[in-house]
Amino acid sequence: MLLTGCTDGRPKAADPAISLERRMREAAVRDSARLLERYDSTAAAHPALAGRLAPLRAAVAAHVSALSPAVPGAPSPSPSASPSGGTGAAAPAASGEPVPAKPEEALTALADAERSLSEARTIDLAGAPAELARMLASVAACGAVHVYLLTSTPGAKP
């Protein structure tokens, strides 16, 4: 006697934890990509800040890659992308907000964006699956360090 298994032809329901994680990762990637664009806009508007911003920008690009859901063949952002030189005038940031004309104010605006995103990620920890929560915590901590670096005077003693 031969027994065969049958299904009713309907697709299996998606694992809600997996879809929650995927949605959270996709939102985190979008947020980091917007922050990455702000770094690019700020460096383009203030070329003298580009060197100071480069390592922070590279870290944000790494966050985009690390948070991205595994999609075969998907390109990742370049951590070494260099924006074109600007005139120092206010340039529109990717978020639609202009980059402030003064370098100090541009750094403050970038620090505010980092702070807001770091705080949002900290809040998201409560609902995230364990592995993603650990990653969000790490990225949020990195954002807090970026806030410090963006608002401190280079070379000054603490």
Segments the model singles out, each with a brief description of its role:
Residues L2-P158:
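All-alpha RGS (Regulator of G-protein Signaling) helical domain and cognate RGS-like helical scaffolds
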